[in-house]
Design a protein with these regions (language model features):
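Phosphate-coordination loops involved in phosphoryl transfer and adenosine-cofactor binding
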Residues: 2
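Rossmann-fold cofactor-recognition segment
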Residues: 49-62
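Conserved glycine-rich Rossmann-like NAD(P)H-binding loop of the short-chain dehydrogenase/reductase
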Residues: 25-42
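Aromatic pocket-lining residues of Rossmann-like dinucleotide-binding sites
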Residues: 22
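N-terminal Rossmann-fold NAD(P) dinucleotide-binding loop
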Residues: 15-16
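Conserved glycine-rich cofactor-binding loop
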Residues: 11-12
Length: 62
């Protein structure tokens, strides 16, 4: 069973790399960040690359 992993700051850099690593391991991810457009772009890219995982996005500033 896949785990659901929450990642803050997922729109670039380390956060984006961590999200990709978890998806490669078969986990689902919850992406959060301030840049709404970038979150939606990543969601689309990840859905195409990892069709068996679920990606949720929530714009927020921690």
């Amino acid at each position: 069973m896949a785990k659901n992993v929450v990642i803050t700051g997922a729109t670039s850099g380390i956060g984006e790399a961590i999200a990709r690593a978890y998806l490669e391991q078969g986990e689902n991810v919850v992406l959060t960040g301030r840049r709404t457009a970038r979150l939606e772009t990543l969601k689309s890219e990840f859905a195409e690359t990892f069709p068996n995982q679920t990606v949720w996005t929530f714009p927020l500033d921690v």
